[in-house]
């Protein structure tokens, strides 16, 4: 139900105001008790209902408590600050000015019994008459109040208009910002679309380039395979021909040796000469694979996962010494015969002995050291450099390998996955002795790439990105960097470069 309908239901038809002590008469209509008393006939007999004219006796009045409570609650809700320009009793616009009471009233007040006989004028006309100066200087106080009220009303109206103008200006500004934001969003979407297409196009080019490079390397490898097969077949054919010739000569010599003495003495030099000139000194070259696995952009891709590896000096063999910043390590095993001079030389050369920490297991038999890093997940890449071309080994290992006593046992079987390398080449650490693989140019810097997701550790030439070897170490949950140095060998861990 609308607020106006509720107010109408709670308004007395006689005084046109909220019910005061409402009562019901025989016909069912409700009125204020005071309004009925003021309209009763002097004799006290039955009186007609002001609404339907049905006669009712004064004794038939019944208090309407429900209507009284509803009226009280409604009036209570409407208490509080009355907005300017509204009637404090009925919350209706003040459109009239009561000349008898000298105050503005609403249309409901005009119809009430209180103002039925009063003279009314529109509030704008009343204000205009006073504004134009049609009043004496000795005006009464009620006129001053009226003027103040009307001036306040128009000031408030001016403030509302000013506020409205400000709000309109703000709305225009916000709408402009909204248009700019929509434009920015559209441009951003276009840029995202363009960038997505650019990325897709560039990676498609890169993919095509890699496919072409793959085909080129495979063609080179196939060509090398055919040439090597041809050479091997030629060598095999030549060896077979030599073997057949030797067999024939052996039979011929055997037959000559069984011939009579006179026949043997007739021409012995021919057979002897043929056996002497038979050349069996063939130089068979070792078969090598010359086509290397060099993937373009491999170095750049690996450096995305580069990590800083620090040496755990408390795990190092006593013969290993470290630089002051801890990135260089050297094996001083050859200087063990003069330890005093060796210690002094290490001091002046900037080297220091490994730090000793109580209750930490270290390598006692092999010149090894571990890295501080412990890898359990993710992808990691680091580089190791050897500047003296002596034999070294780098890779990863389990944490419980410090007790190994024999170099020949360093292999995946004991939890070490590494490669040896020196000026002679490189070979996977799967036991001694190993057959080195030549690397051109000479290998002096190796990259180690550990992928815990696939469980593989791969080795690359850090100079040109050529793949060297890959181990599987997926069965181990914790891995650490591993380093082994031959006598007088040294290793350097380069600092991490910027990853882009």
Swiss-Prot record:
Pathway where this protein functions: Protein modification; protein ubiquitination
B box-type zinc finger locations on the chain: 82-123
Coiled-coil stretches: 212-253
Every B30.2/SPRY domain range: 288-500
One matching Pfam family: SPRY
GO molecular function terms listed in the Swiss-Prot or TrEMBL record: identical protein binding; ubiquitin protein ligase activity; ubiquitin-protein transferase activity; zinc ion binding
Reaction catalysis annotation: S-ubiquitinyl-[E2 ubiquitin-conjugating enzyme]-L-cysteine + [acceptor protein]-L-lysine = [E2 ubiquitin-conjugating enzyme]-L-cysteine + N(6)-ubiquitinyl-[acceptor protein]-L-lysine
Protein name in UniProt: E3 ubiquitin-protein ligase TRIM4
Species of the source: Homo sapiens (Human)
């Amino acid at each position: 139900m609308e607020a106006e309908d509720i107010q109408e239901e709670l308004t007395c038809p006689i005084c046109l105001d909220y019910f005061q002590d409402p009562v019901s008469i025989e016909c069912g209509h409700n009125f204020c008790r005071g309004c009925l008393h003021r309209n009763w006939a002097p004799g006290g007999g039955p009186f007609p209902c002001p609404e339907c004219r049905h006669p009712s006796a004064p004794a038939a009045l019944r208090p309407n408590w429900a209507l009284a409570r509803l009226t009280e609650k409604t009036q209570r809700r409407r208490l509080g600050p009355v907005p300017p320009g509204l009637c404090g009793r009925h919350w209706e616009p003040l459109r009239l000015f009561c000349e008898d009471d000298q105050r503005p009233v609403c249309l409901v007040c005009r119809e009430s019994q209180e103002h039925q006989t009063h003279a009314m004028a529109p509030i704008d006309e009343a204000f205009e008459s006073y504004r134009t100066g049609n009043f004496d200087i000795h005006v009464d106080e009620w006129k001053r109040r009226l003027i103040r009220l009307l001036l306040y009303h128009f000031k408030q109206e001016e403030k509302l208009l000013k506020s409205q103008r400000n709000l309109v200006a703000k709305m225009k500004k916000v709408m402009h910002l909204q248009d700019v934001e929509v434009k920015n969003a559209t441009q951003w979407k276009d840029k995202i679309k363009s960038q997505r297409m650019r990325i897709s196009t560039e990676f498609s080019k890169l993919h095509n380039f890699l496919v072409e490079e793959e085909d080129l390397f495979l063609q080179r490898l196939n060509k090398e395979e055919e040439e090597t097969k041809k050479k091997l077949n030629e060598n095999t054919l030549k060896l077979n021909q030599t073997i057949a010739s030797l067999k024939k000569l052996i039979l011929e010599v055997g037959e000559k040796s069984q011939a009579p003495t006179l026949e043997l003495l007739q021409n012995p030099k021919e057979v002897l000469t043929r056996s002497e000139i038979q050349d069996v000194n063939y130089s068979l070259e070792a078969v090598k694979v010359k086509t290397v696995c060099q993937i373009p952009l491999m170095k750049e891709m690996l450096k995305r996962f580069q990590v800083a590896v620090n040496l755990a000096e408390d795990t190092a063999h006593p013969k290993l010494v470290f630089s002051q910043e801890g990135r260089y390590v050297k094996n001083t095993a050859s200087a063990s015969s003069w330890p005093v001079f060796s210690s002094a030389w290490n001091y002046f050369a900037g080297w220091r002995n490994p730090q000793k920490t109580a209750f930490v297991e270290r390598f006692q038999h092999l010149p090894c050291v571990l890295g501080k890093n412990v890898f359990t997940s993710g992808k990691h890449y680091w580089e190791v450099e050897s500047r003296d071309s002596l034999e070294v080994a780098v890779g990863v290992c389990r944490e419980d390998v410090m007790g190994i006593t024999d170099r020949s046992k360093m292999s995946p079987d004991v939890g070490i996955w590494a490669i040896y390398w020196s000026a002679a080449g490189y070979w996977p650490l799967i036991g001694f002795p190993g057959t080195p693989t030549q690397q051109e140019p000479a290998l002096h810097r190796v990259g180690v790439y550990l992928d815990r997701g696939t469980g593989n550790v791969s080795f690359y030439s850090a100079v040109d990105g050529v793949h060297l070897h890959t181990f599987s170490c997926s069965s181990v949950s914790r891995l650490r960097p591993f380093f082994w140095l031959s006598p007088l060998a040294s290793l350097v861990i380069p600092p991490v470069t910027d990853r882009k």
